[in-house]
């Protein structure tokens, strides 16, 4: 039972780190990255659809993205979705593809993006700590119910603390990498 609690906590913490990593890919860095369009939705036959499912996105140059819709009829819808998103980019339509040039970020904008990245990292760490707290509560309940001895529970709590510290460090590392990426000119 103790192993199940620790395993479940570790699985959930791994998922949280992955979610944080995914969340950070949506922050614009000044370099072309197809992942920045992950959250952009366009109306496709009346259904909001991610533009990443409606087109192929390639990076021909470090600061340019090419978006080639699978159906030419969806070109205008994708263009409008990108314009209306909060990415701060303006696509140009040449009839075949959309070209999106990524403008250089200003120093002030970079600092705002770093703050945003740190906030997302903090959200990830809070989620990990909440998972730890839930695991600790489950361990204490096991001990209270008499299903596990005090020594076993204390050892499991130490293990859970160690695992938690490792995952918090992973989130810090992911955020630090993103911060470094953002501050590169």
Swiss-Prot record:
GO terms for molecular function: ribosomal large subunit binding. Responsible for the release of ribosomes from messenger RNA at the termination of protein biosynthesis. May increase the efficiency of translation by recycling ribosomes from one round of translation to another. The keyword Cytoplasm applies. It is found in: Cytoplasm. This is Ribosome-recycling factor. Keywords: Cytoplasm, Protein biosynthesis. Belongs to the RRF family. GO terms for cellular component: cytoplasm. It comes from Corynebacterium glutamicum (strain R). Signal peptide: none annotated. NCBIfam families: frr (TIGR00496). Its main location: cytoplasm. CDD domains: RRF. GO terms for biological process: translational termination. The keyword Iron-sulfur does not apply. It comes from the Bacteria. The lineage of its organism: Bacteria, Bacillati, Actinomycetota, Actinomycetes, Mycobacteriales. SUPFAM superfamilies: Ribosome recycling factor, RRF (SSF55194). InterPro entries: Ribosome_recyc_fac, Ribosome_recyc_fac_dom, RRF_sf.
